[in-house]
Amino acid sequence: MQREPLVSLPATLLAPAVGELGGDNRPPARFLMGVDGGATKTLAAVLDLQERRLHLGHGGSSNPDSVGAHAATDSLVKATDEAIDRAGIEREQLDGAVLAIAGTDTDAVATNVRERCPSAWTVVNDVVGAWAAATAARPGVGVISGTGSNVLGVGHGGHVWRAGGWGHVLGDEGSGYWLALQSIRAALADREASGPETALVTAAIDFFEVPSVEALATLVYTKPLSKGEIAAFAIETARVAHAGDEVARSLYLRAADELARQIAAVIEQTTLTGEFPVGLIGSAFKAGELFVAPLASAIAELAPRARVAVVEMAPVGGCVLLAALAAGRPYSVDPGELKPLLDAALVHEAVLRD
């Protein structure tokens, strides 16, 4: 059955995927901005092509599904204004801007963002930035597993397909939130003797600072805990799994299966074949081979020549690459040069905040 894609991209952003870059004959660009907005935080980066410097801006969650449209847009404006101010420019001086924001799949949400941002700025879903960081905006697949999860692929003919990204109530399988929630459920199952014993019980008690694991139910429902607060427990899931707990380890196998199912749909619908990158992005992959190895194995069965790797460049870097495409200056940014600039800016920010 023929299905309509859940997401579409402007033709300018698909130029590398379809081999239509053409010549870059416009005057050189000076300032480009990329924004990566997720359920936990928002990061904006303005690249000064003349000075070869990146200026960063920060905000809270910009996912309207998590915090509401108004608060999400406030975070977005805060981050972009901060980055633009640090670059010492006005909004109008940006040659291109791409905002990859979680939850912006619907026209209504995108319209709300555009009401407070210049119309020339391109607004796409956050997984688009991850795909660009993973593939340099060329055919391939980007996989997010952070607080939430999402998969996007672009085929050699520019066909786009997304799977996942339905939020923590309806989806987010294989994400940090999902891993944390399954860990809490496993701890409760241990407590009531309906599941195997697991060190996740002690880990949950210590992490959430509750007197007993059953007290978690009260904490979750009466406080209530936010999506991000629950997702933060995934770091303990990884620690317990690395220590050899079989229940925690099994959760990573299940998470890999969930993501592989979505990746399979994306590969099939985009008709990707041969050699192409599958880039893994997000905090959940910090668990390392515990998570990456079973996922890579599952992907190898789907596409034996796919190159699976954890992406080293942050998604906001992918958004800057897309901003160059949106500005019609596809050759103005070298991905190999952008990553060290971004790494240096992030290290500088971390030092300032400590």
Set out the residue ranges of the language-model regions:
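Phosphate-binding/catalytic loop of phosphoryl-transfer enzymes
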Residues: A100-L200, L346-D354
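Glycine-rich beta-strand-to-loop/alpha-helix junction loops that act as flexible
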Residues: V98-T104, S145-T147, F276-A287
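Proline-centered loop/turn at the N-terminus of a beta-strand
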Residues: G96, A120-T122, P277
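Broad gene-expression machinery/nucleic-acid interaction feature
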Residues: K41, G96, G148
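ATP-binding/phosphotransfer module of carbohydrate and carboxylate kinases, centering on a glycine-rich
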Residues: Q2-Q93, A133-P139, I184-D354
